[in-house]
Each structure stands twice: as structure tokens, then as C-alpha cells.
Curated annotation (Swiss-Prot):
The chain crosses the membrane at residues 694-714. This is Envelope glycoprotein H. The lineage of its organism: Viruses, Duplodnaviria, Heunggongvirae, Peploviricota, Herviviricetes. Residues 715-717 are intravirion. The heterodimer glycoprotein H-glycoprotein L is required for the fusion of viral and plasma membranes leading to virus entry into the host cell. Following initial binding to host receptor, membrane fusion is mediated by the fusion machinery composed of gB and the heterodimer gH/gL. May also be involved in the fusion between the virion envelope and the outer nuclear membrane during virion morphogenesis.
Amino acid sequence: MTILQLFLVFLNILEALCDYQLPKPRINKPPAEERLKLRNGYNTTLIEFDDGVQSFNLNWTKIIEHIPHDELIELWREANVTEPLVNTLLKRSDTYRPETNVHIPGHGNSYACALPYWSYTIDQWEDNKTTGYLGNFGIPSKTVLNEFFYDFQYVYTNRQFYTEATYVLNCLIGATTPAYPTISCHITPNYLFVSVEFTKFDSLTLLFGHSHYLPPLKGHIVYNDIEGASNDVFSLVIFSTYDLFGKHVESFKFDIAKVFREIIETPPLTFIKNLQDEMFTIEIRDGCNINNIVNPKTFLFAFKAVVAHFLVIDSLRTQQHILLNCFANYMSELEFLRKLMESCFEFFEFDFPYTVIETLAASQALNVPKHVITSLSHQDKTNMLSLFRLSRHSKHVSAVAISEIIDLISHIYTAYSYTYMLTSSERKMLLDAYIVLNDIMHKNETVKKQDLLPYVLSSSMCTSLEIGNLLLHFGQKDVLDVYETFSPCYLSLRFDFTKEKLITEFPQSSLIAQKEINLGTNGFFQTLHMRHHTSLEILPIIKCIKSLSTDIILSIPLKNITYVISTKPVPNSKIYDVSEVFLKTSMIISAVNNDCKPYQGGSAAHQIPVIYNVTVPRRGCPYCSSVVLSYDESQGFQSMMYITDTYVQENLFTEHSPFFGDGNLHIHYLILMNNGTVIEVRGAYRARLVNFIIVIMVFILFLVGLYLLYKLFVYLT
């Protein structure tokens, strides 16, 4: 054996032994007597190597005092010291090396949830009780960190580096049946790695972690060869082979330095939000077929999603206490990201426990004063909604959360009645409310009538204008914004969403290409059917309308009565048939008693009376708890507005109200009263339209007159 070969042998042994981490607990620990025999058998064994440049001395006595015999054998096997040098060189030459290795000075963005100077800390909480309700206090970082890293196990790394025993979180993306490709990920306290496994033996792995605490490599590679980017704290490394690169060249088409910059330079919540947008876009645009995993877009998304979780956990190591509401925001946004991934991929599993934060969030939610949310700042509203989201599975929180969410949506709805538009921050808060209500309402066996108000208000904000704007967004944006594309329609009690219906709602313009119409219609339709989880099951009258569930267009639960808009009448209800004015479809309005008691006035359809010139009432709110509904003679139901207070009433019936500003004589308006009475509204909105038509006709006649005078002048001259 040459000196070079001896040197490589001892180098491998030293590296394996020096970097070995002792598992807890030891596995297959030999009895004390056997260990004593082994120690006596090896206590004179010394291994020395000295080539004049470096010297190595291994004392078996010291080694076996700390490493059990069977594990020592496993170390020897994994070190593979008898491997021919030719094989080692071949593996080295076949190791894939990125074209560049970029170093970016600095530490990158901080994920730390630092405590403000005015905050306080809580190290223990008895009976899960805390003070305050916005999470403005610090909690021990170690308590949260210990919950994440509870599972001590071996980390197997597809032969890139030595097996390590450490704390680890695992995730897997793949198919419900054993198949390739799959994506596996592993998060440890110091690093993470994500692998796309093409076969049992071929994989592409990205590793990200603290530069000085990366796992020990095997002898044929060094980090300088495979590192793609780094800063003063973290490194990003790629593991693969040139042989695999040749087989899956498309999967390697990404800029590793650009990915690293995106990770370290994007603010934390923005980075997580961008990942939510990216996942949503992949789901709507590209689909979530398991074969798309080999696409670099999907693989890089999965890698960045795992990095986001790692960086949030890693922030716990930098401080003794963390601010609860700050960390709760991270947890709620990461949870939503995982929910998006779960709804997309055929098989998705991510071990990410957060019971400590969940428990503290519930304790804070239970302290929330009644009707306080609308008086809070935007950031405090966000903090409260994050606490509700994390604690929504606690049955004790349900009543508090629903009460505050009703106030919040009512506040948003009143502001909406002025402009008929929603801001990005309002859509985000509606999304938070949607997440909370979705879980709570479907778990409640009995639903109170007042708890249905968010669904009525959401139905009111799901107007033709809202649908048209969303169709444009889905049709024209390359990256879909998960907040901007969230619609009140997902919380509505509308059930008439078909592709044909959506096409009629698309804004009419010669500037809109057919491709945009197709993208918009398909995207919004797909999202509606994924996100619109509102069910008739939450309605108290479900037992008397269940047989007509497929015929229902809209349900409007009011305080004293529930209106059901459908293509067939609801038995034992007060019926208004408006089908005689339709050209293509039919629509029947049924007023159903909330206790499902039969209507005593007979089964014959009632005629809808007409009133004219509805104006804003000067005093009081006579239309409160009523609904104004619009429908088209050709396309059927269009929009509705529920009148909650005098502000909404005034905005609805004002002269410039967008609700009555369609300018289409084929659109009719009905008022559905809280006592079961339905009336048709005609008046100012039609008078304005008639006046507009008269002005147009006069203008046309004026132009014709000018033209005739011009022709006469030409003829005479």
C-alpha cells in the first residue's frame, strides 16, 4: 500500500470519528462485561501514521470508551476505507459542480422576533392562562424549540455524507402509491436538505445551513467544489452527478445564486407570502400532477418552502425569549402555506408540531374583550386574526372568534358599500376570517342564526363587478396573488357558479384576448370549486330544502325568514315566481320559515308588487335586515346587497349608487323583506337611463340636421 493510500485510509477514519455525534439513547449497547473484554483486548492497540508532514495517532482505548462496539463496526463499514482509490477518483470526477460559487457579504434578513422595550416575559403559564389578548409578551425560545426537535433519529443522506444521529423534522411529497419521482426533506438544528428522487439510486439534493455546521462529507468531495452560493452565515450546496445531469438536464435549469439571494434578501413574511403566491400559481396554472415534481419550478418551490420553515425555527436560537404575536404570525402563515401544498399534491406529509404556540394563542383568544376588533390598528387586527387562526381548533375559542369576525366583516362591508371595491388588506383579513370560519362552522353541530351573518355579507360582496375583476386578474397575471385573488364569493351562499355563468360576467372589451378569457374563466372556476367550501349543511333550514340542493342558486338566511332562490319551488313555503320575465332560464323565490313550519297561505305563486322612485329614507332604517337583489332577464341572478345599517341603506339608494348603475333595462331589482314580502323596485335608475337615451337621440338628430344643412349648402353652391 502506498503512502498516499495509507494517508487516505487514515483521513477517512479520522473524519468519520471526529465528526461522529453520539446518538441518544445508544442503540444495542453491549453489556458491561462484554465492553470490559473488548477494552482489555484492544488496550494495547495504537495506530500511528507519520509521513514527515502530518502525523496521526489513534488510541483504541479512548475510542471504545465512548463508542459502542456495534456502532464502531458500522462506522468502519460506512467509512469504506477499503474502497479502491480508482473508485474514489471516479466518484470525485462524476460529482456535479455548479458553474459558479457566489459569496454575498453580510448576514441576510433576520427572522428574530425581538421583544420591544415595553414588553414583558412569561416563562411559565399555569392552567394555560395568560394576561392580555394580543400576544404582546415574550415566551422562552427553548420551550418552542424543544417541541420542534423532539425526534432524535438517524438522518440518511443518499450517500452524499455520513449518516448522522440528530434531531430532525421530515416531510415528503409524492404519490399515494409507491412511485418515483418523490421529494423528501429533512430539517435539523443546523441545516436542511431537500432531495428529488428520480429512482431509488438517483437524486438531486439541495442543502442549506450554517456554513460552519454542515454535515461531514465523504472523502471524494469537499464543500468548495459543490457550493453554489454563501454569505457570512449560510451556504447553499448542490449534490448530484454529471451522469444524472445528462438524464435530467431540465431539472438543473435554475440559477442557484439567484435562489440564494431570494432566500437571504427577502423580508421573512414577504418571502413566505411569495411562496404562497407561487404555490397557488403552480396549482392553477401548471397543475399538481406528480410528474411535475421534476420541473425545476416545483422542486425549487418545495426547497424554498422548507427553507422558510428552517429559518423561522433557526431564529429561536438567537434569543432567549421571542415575542408571541410575531412568532404566531410566522406560524399561521406557514400553516397556510402547508395547507396550499396539501391541497395541491397527491401526497403531502410535513411533521411540524406547534402545540405550545397553539395553546398560548387559545389562552390569548379567550381574553379578547367583546366587540374590540374594529377599534384596533391594522397590525393589531392582523395579530388577533393570527391568534384566532392558530387556536381555531379549540372549542372554547369558537364563540369569541365568531363574534369578533362578525364585527370585522360587518365593518369591511360598510366600507365596501361606499365604493364596491375591496383593498388588498381587506381581502387578507377576509382570508383570515375564511380560514377560521371554515373550520369552526363545519364542526359545530348547531349553528346560531346570528353566526350566519358573515355568509350573507360575503354573498352581498360577491357581485358581478367583483367576479369580473377576479376574472381579469386570473386571465392577465403571470403570478397569481393569493390575497388579491381571494374573493368573498368563497364564503358566499351562492351556488350558481358555472363556466357559462362566469363567461357572461367577463368584462366586455375588444382589448381582452380570447386566451385571457379562457385563462380567467378556467382559473376562477377552478379556484371557486377548491375554495368555496360553504355548504347548505350550515343552514338551520337544511332539513326542509335538502331534496332541492342541486337546484338552489342562492340562499339568504335573515333573522325571521330564509329566502331560497332556485329553479324549483321549496315545498311548504311562500313562493314568488319570476320566471315569466326570463328568456333563457327560470327563477323562483321561496320564503321559508327558519323552523321549517309550513306556510299557511297556500302553495300558489304570489305576484310581485311594483313600487317606483325609491329614495333614501330621511329617518331611521326601514330597509334594515332586508335584501336588494338584481337579476337579468337572460342570465338570471346577478347581485345582492344586505342592508345592515343606515350607512349601507344610504349608500345603496343614493343617486350615484353603482348597484343601480348598470344602465341595462333588462336588469330587474327586488327587495326581499325580513317578513317574507318581496317587491320589485322601479324608478330613478330607469328614469336616469331613459333621460340618457333621450339625450343620445337628441344629439343624433342634431348631427343629422347638421349633415342635411351641409348637403343643402353644397347643393346650393
